[in-house]
Amino acid sequence: MYDKYLVTGATGFLGRAVVEALVRRGARVYALVLHDDPYINLLPKEVHTVIGDVCVKNSLTDFFADADSRTCVIHCAGIVSVASRPGSRLYQVNVGGTWSVLRQCMERNVGKMVYVSSV
């Protein structure tokens, strides 16, 4: 078990299940959530929330501030679309946001990064 878990997409279906499982195991969990996320109150009270966006570098800097080799990042943030031509926001979040999270993981030398995708 790691000292700390950073979870993106923590209020989504998969992300919330991951967060709840970690909390049940007694883990220290930090969740990156959008400032206007209507589901933030559904997270367990033990979860430390950090307001931010995977597409905004400054908010990731705050989220990763204390990350190190004893940290596990679980990246669940993403947008699912069934449109034949997905919009630019989908690309920004799913590709750009994932790249930004991965870059922070490499810069901080985190112990493990788990990428969850529903695509």
Mark where each language-model region is.
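N-terminal Rossmann NAD(P)H-binding glycine-rich loop of SDR-like oxidoreductase domains
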Residues: 2-25
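Conserved acidic residues
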Residues: 3, 47, 71, 111
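Residues at the starts of beta-strands that form the adenosine-phosphate
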Residues: 4, 28-30, 111-113
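SDR active-site strand-loop-helix element
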Residues: 8, 32, 73-77, 113-119
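Conserved glycine-rich Rossmann-like NAD(P)H-binding loop of the short-chain dehydrogenase/reductase
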Residues: 27-37
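NAD(P)H-binding glycine-rich loop region in Rossmannoid oxidoreductase-like domains
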Residues: 38, 48-96, 104
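Conserved Rossmann-fold NAD(P)-dependent oxidoreductase catalytic core, especially the SDR/UDP-sugar
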Residues: 96-119
